[in-house]
């Protein structure tokens, strides 16, 4: 058996060798040789792969070294060291700009979120305000209707005091409800407190009225007499009252106004006491002068004034304008007398018949004949005092036509029947 080994071929990068085997033996030797070749090939393949990887690494290192050399040459060429600070500052500013831009974007996003929350809150407030305006509109409509009903005169109702207070309390409640609905704070506790205070005020309202009654009862008796004189002067004719229409008004105006607002119940007793005092004073004065006492027609006439005064007071409570026209006696009597003319004349006509009967009884008790007719709108009395009283009753009957035909009765006649010293 002859074996020949050949050296590697020049220029080849592989470390494998070509083996030529000359086998002169049989088939068994050829198979063994093939097995050896395969084993050698299997052993050399990993070495070949490793050598290829080393070659690639060497090539990469060469490229890196070549690039480093190129950069070094460029740095030396363009003086990189001098521009190094400038490049760093530019990079720093660029980074800062990016950070500021990012922070601004975040801030804008936060502001946008806050604006959205504010818009939603304002939308809710707008809805609440619309609801409040709607409720306030309803409350104002109710208050308007209540005030219209309050200002509408009711001629059928004579007990205006308590109803007027209740209507005022209702008006106050509606006004407070309106203010409460339109106010920014809408708490249920405040509403309950307002209702409690309102109920307390309504319950406490009769107390000041009772105190006012007590104070008016303490007014001296002479002020009642002056009130009667002032009232008779205020209803006198326009031609005869200028000489003395301001005698008692300027000095006793407050007292007269306090008398005019007395309750109907208390005014009845007070007027009765005042009439008794006036009659007693007049009878005493006439007894001292030696004259006959005052006939009872004066009592009837003053009772008519009393009833007219009580009804006029109720009208004054409903209408402040009528209080002004009846209390201010320095104005024209023909204008101020119109609101209560019908009521006063009706009362006078009712009392004239009873005055005739009482006059006849009074004259019959004295044994004198007294005609009860009304010739020339005057009574026929025995003495001068009775004639003056008849003139006063006749003046009341002629008061219907005082605007067109003023009465000629002097003021001294009217004043003398009440203010005889």
Curated annotation (Swiss-Prot):
Any Pfam family matching the protein: Olduvai
Transmembrane segments: none
InterPro entries: NBPF (IPR055306), Olduvai_dom (IPR010630)
Protein name: Putative NBPF family member NBPF7
Family: Belongs to the NBPF family.
Bias type Basic and acidic residues, positions: 194-217, 312-333
Keyword annotations: Coiled coil, Cytoplasm, Repeat
Region (Disordered): 179-251, 312-334, 402-421
SMART domains, per database record: DUF1220
